[in-house]
C-alpha cells in the first residue's frame, strides 16, 4: 500500500457529505504479456536494416499477447495488482473506468466484464475510448467522482494493439505493443492526490492515425478486411510527430499554469510512451531535464492508453512521498491531456 495520509473511509451511496479535498493514489498495478518480440526479429520480418527500429523509435522489444489473451485478461491482472497494493477489497470500489481502444468486442463494453471478474459487486463500469490520452481523460473523470462520492475508483488503461496493426507496415507494427496498467484512487483530506487536470481536443486532424473500417461510417465487409481497412493507418508520420510533441509540451504548460506552478516544482515528468524521439522532442519543447523524465519505451513499446499507468506502476520505486508528477499525453483524434499528481 502506498504511504497513507488522511485517507477517508468511503461513505454509503445514500450518505451526504462535503466533497473530499483530493483523490489520492492508493495503489498501482501492471500487466505485461510474457512474450516479448525483439526489434531485431521485427526488422527481419519486415526486411529492415539491423538497428533501424531502435534508432528511430528507441524500442528494443515489444510485449505481445498470445493467441488466447485479450484486453480484459490484461486489465484484470493489472486491476488485481493495484487492488492488492492498495489493500482494498473489491467491495470498496465504486466505479471502474477502462481506457481502451481495443475492447474485447464492439458490443458490449469490456469494463463490466473486467468488473465482474475482479468481484467489483458495488461498482459501475464503463469503457472510455480516448486513444493514447484515454487514461488521463479517465483520471480526470475519476478525480471528480472520487471527491464528490467519497468512494474509491479503479482506473485501468489496457490495449492489445498487436491485433490492430498491419504486420507489413513498419510505421505501426514496429511501434505498437500490448499491456495494461491500473491505479486505485481514493478520497483524501491531505495534500496527496490529483492537483489539476487539463484536457484538449482538435478534431481537424482526426485522420492522422485511424482505423478506416469497423464503425458506422464504414462498416466491415469482406472486401474491406481483404484490403486491411480494419487495421491502423498512419497517414503522415512526420505531421503526427510534430503535432504530438508540441501537444504534449503545451498540455504540460497548460496544467502547470492552471495549478499556479512551474516546471521547477515537478519532480517527475511521465509522458505517454509513444517512442523515444517523440518523448525527446516534447521534453525539449517543455524544458524538462532528462534526469527527471520517465522513459521506459525501450522495453514496453507503445500500448497507447496503457503506457502511463504502466510507467506509474513499474517506476513507482523512484517516486518519493510528496513528489509532484506531471503526466502528459496526446492521442489520435487529436486528443491531448495533462494531469498533476502529488504522490
Swiss-Prot record:
The catalysed reaction is:
malonyl-[ACP] + an acyl-CoA + H(+) = a 3-oxoacyl-[ACP] + CO2 + CoA; glutaryl-CoA + malonyl-[ACP] + H(+) = 3-oxo-6-carboxyhexanoyl-[ACP] + CO2 + CoA
Which UniProt keywords are present, listed alphabetically?
Answer: Acyltransferase, Biotin biosynthesis, Transferase
What processes in GO biological process is this protein linked to? biotin biosynthetic process; fatty acid biosynthetic process; secondary metabolite biosynthetic process
Q: Which InterPro entries match?
A: ACP_syn_III_C (IPR013747), ACP_syn_III_N (IPR013751), BioZ (IPR046403), Thiolase-like (IPR016039)
Q: Which Pfam families match?
A: ACP_syn_III, ACP_syn_III_C
Q: Tell me which domain of life the UniProt entry assigns to the organism this sequence originates from.
A: Bacteria
The molecular function GO annotations come to: 3-oxoacyl-[acyl-carrier-protein] synthase activity
| Residues of the active site | 132, 272, 302
Tell me the segments the record calls region ACP-binding.
273-277
Q: What is its EC number?
A: 2.3.1.-
Q: In which pathway does it act?
A: Cofactor biosynthesis; biotin biosynthesis
Q: Which family does it belong to?
A: Belongs to the thiolase-like superfamily. BioZ family.
What is this protein's function per UniProt? Involved in the formation of the biotin precursor pimeloyl-ACP. Catalyzes the condensation of glutaryl-CoA, an intermediate in lysine degradation, with malonyl-ACP to produce 3-oxopimeloyl-ACP.
User: What is the protein's name according to its record?
Assistant: 3-oxopimeloyl-[acyl-carrier-protein] synthase
The organism is: Rhodothermus marinus (strain ATCC 43812 / DSM 4252 / R-10)
Instruction: List the gene name.
Output: bioZ
